[in-house]
Curated annotation (Swiss-Prot):
Residues making up the signal peptide according to the UniProt record: none
PANTHER family listed in its UniProt record: ALTERED INHERITANCE OF MITOCHONDRIA PROTEIN 24, MITOCHONDRIAL (PTHR36959:SF2)
Keywords of this entry: Mitochondrion, Transit peptide
GO cellular component, one term: mitochondrial inner membrane
Stretches assigned to coiled coil: none
Annotated source species: Yarrowia lipolytica (strain CLIB 122 / E 150) (Yeast)
Keyword Signal attributed: no
Presequence range in chain numbering: 1-101
Pfam families attached to this UniProt entry: AIM24
Gene name of the record: AIM24
Subcellular location: Mitochondrion
Protein known as: Altered inheritance of mitochondria protein 24, mitochondrial
Broad class of where this protein is predominantly found: mitochondrion
């Protein structure tokens, strides 16, 4: 037997050069009456790195183990482990350990997603006029800004009135930059005032919120499924038998039949509570901006069991 060898030609794709991003150091301090805010710049297609331009006297919060490279004077940079609402985020299964990086001199850092799944990054810039809600538990990746407030949900078992549950949400207010990590690629949708959209909750990464609106977090709806229409042949004998069957009529009017229906509804509700039904959608009204991820997370990670039961058992 002759052994046949096939030759494979390989080509090296040109790597992204990040030298310039590392060399660009901010020249204005992050303190004083007119501070320079840290700047986030995504790198890659889709972005998997973020270049952070850190002015002097400023602070960066980044997920633990995400730092790839640092350009700056080593003796002017300090890093220590910090927790973000450890109890509330632990109960909800959310990451709570972050590196708090401070610099007394200008520095530039590269941070990576460092995830076991295919992911990409999106940068959200807050100017103090628009707030954001992060809908995924593990989407908060890095943030910077002295006037930026990152507030995890502390209502552990409650839901937003008339809308989605706040289980696992994180609220962003103030001024600063935030890096979010999503599964797959991240896309942006802009809705005008008279527009609305249906989004699967497992694909919803983040969205702008307006506290003055009637329903700032959207509302759950159920996608209706029509039963298949079967054309059966007419059987007069069977039709007369069923029409004149007093036993069948008595069964349909009995308490036992109603008990069977209630049991069936209870089973559907329990199944939806623990496993979901796959047809829950979130109706979001404009005006607002939405970030969606191309790959889904487990629906039970972002929606409470009570909300799953309510939507799954509805007709």
């Amino acid at each position: 037997m002759r052994l046949q060898l096939r030759s494979f030609s390989t080509s090296l794709r040109r790597a992204n050069n990040v030298s310039q991003q590392l060399k660009d150091l901010p020249s204005v301090s992050g303190g004083g009456p007119f501070p320079l805010l840290p700047q986030f710049q995504p790198i890659g297609t889709p972005p998997s790195l973020v270049s952070v331009s850190l002015p002097a006297s400023s602070t960066l919060f980044a997920r633990r183990g995400s730092i790839v490279s640092i350009n700056g004077q080593l003796d002017t940079i300090t890093s220590r482990l910090s927790s973000l609402s450890a109890f509330a985020r632990t109960v909800q299964g959310m990451p709570f350990l972050y590196n708090r990086i401070s610099a007394t001199a200008p520095a530039t850092l590269l941070v990576s997603t460092n995830t076991s799944y295919q992911s990409s990054l999106a940068i959200v810039s807050l100017d103090g006029r628009t707030d954001w809600t992060v809908a995924q538990r593990d989407a908060l990746f890095a943030w910077a800004g002295a006037a930026l407030h990152v507030q995890p949900n502390t209502s552990l078992f409650g839901s937003a009135r008339g809308g989605t549950t706040r289980w696992g949400n994180t609220y962003l207010t103030g001024r600063g930059d935030v890096a979010l990590v999503g599964r797959g690629q991240i896309f942006k949708i802009d809705l005008s005032e008279d527009e609305d959209i249906l989004v699967h909750p497992a694909n919803l990464l983040a969205y702008t919120t307006s506290q003055g609106s009637a329903n700032p977090h959207g509302q759950f709806v159920k996608l209706n499924h029509s039963a298949p229409l079967l054309q059966l042949p007419k059987l007069p004998f069977i039709e007369r038998l069923l029409a004149n069957n007093s036993l069948l009529k008595s069964y349909l009017d009995s308490d036992f039949h109603r008990a069977v229906q209630n049991t069936n509804k209870s089973i559907r509700k329990t199944w939806a509570k623990w496993f979901g039904t796959g047809n829950q959608l979130l109706q979001i009204q404009g005006p607002r901006t939405i970030l969606i991820q191309s790959q889904r997370t487990d629906l039970r990670e972002i929606v409470s069991r009570n909300d799953l039961a309510k939507v799954g058992s509805s007709d």
